[in-house]
Amino acid sequence: MASVGERPAPVPVKDKKLLEVKLGELPSWILMRDFSPSGIFGAFQRGYYRYYNKYINVKKGSISGITMVLACYVLFSYSFSYKHLKHERLRKYH
């Protein structure tokens, strides 16, 4: 047990969350991540479960979780088709 004047032991950079990492530690934190296919799949799976449990699987739910997914879909589809839409917008005659 730590006494009153002692600081708690520092958390290793690998175990820190992204928002807890300082800018000087960021390159070493990124290099410690798992970029294998299973590591990337696990990261997406954790993100999905976090989103699902926070917005979809709640006692008193609302439409906000589904609305965010639809808004992201609209933004991504617009960003992918923007190059095509930009050229059509600049044409004088269709």
UniProtKB/Swiss-Prot annotation:
According to the UniProt entry, its GO molecular function terms are:
proton-transporting ATP synthase activity, rotational mechanism
Origin superkingdom: Eukaryota
Q: Which parts pass through the membrane?
A: 68-85
The PTM N6-acetyllysine maps to 22
InterPro entries, sorted: F1F0-ATPsyn_F_prd
Please state where this protein is localized. Answer: Mitochondrion; Mitochondrion inner membrane
**Main subcellular localisation:** mitochondrion
Pfam families found in the cross-reference section: WRW
List residues modified as N-acetylalanine.
2
Arranged from A to Z, the UniProt key words for this protein are: Acetylation, ATP synthesis, CF(0), Hydrogen ion transport, Ion transport, Membrane, Mitochondrion, Mitochondrion inner membrane, Phosphoprotein, Transmembrane, Transmembrane helix, Transport
GO CC field: mitochondrial inner membrane; proton-transporting ATP synthase complex
Q: Does the keyword Secreted apply?
A: no
The way this protein sits in the membrane is described as:
Single-pass membrane protein
The UniProt similarity line reads:
Belongs to the ATPase F chain family.
Q: What is its quaternary makeup?
A: Component of the ATP synthase complex composed at least of ATP5F1A/subunit alpha, ATP5F1B/subunit beta, ATP5MC1/subunit c (homooctomer), MT-ATP6/subunit a, MT-ATP8/subunit 8, ATP5ME/subunit e, ATP5MF/subunit f, ATP5MG/subunit g, ATP5MK/subunit k, ATP5MJ/subunit j, ATP5F1C/subunit gamma, ATP5F1D/subunit delta, ATP5F1E/subunit epsilon, ATP5PF/subunit F6, ATP5PB/subunit b, ATP5PD/subunit d, ATP5PO/subunit OSCP.
The function of this protein is:
Subunit f, of the mitochondrial membrane ATP synthase complex (F(1)F(0) ATP synthase or Complex V) that produces ATP from ADP in the presence of a proton gradient across the membrane which is generated by electron transport complexes of the respiratory chain. ATP synthase complex consist of a soluble F(1) head domain - the catalytic core - and a membrane F(1) domain - the membrane proton channel. These two domains are linked by a central stalk rotating inside the F(1) region and a stationary peripheral stalk.
Q: What is this protein called?
A: ATP synthase F(0) complex subunit f, mitochondrial
Q: Which organism was this protein described from?
A: Pongo abelii
The gene for this chain is ATP5MF
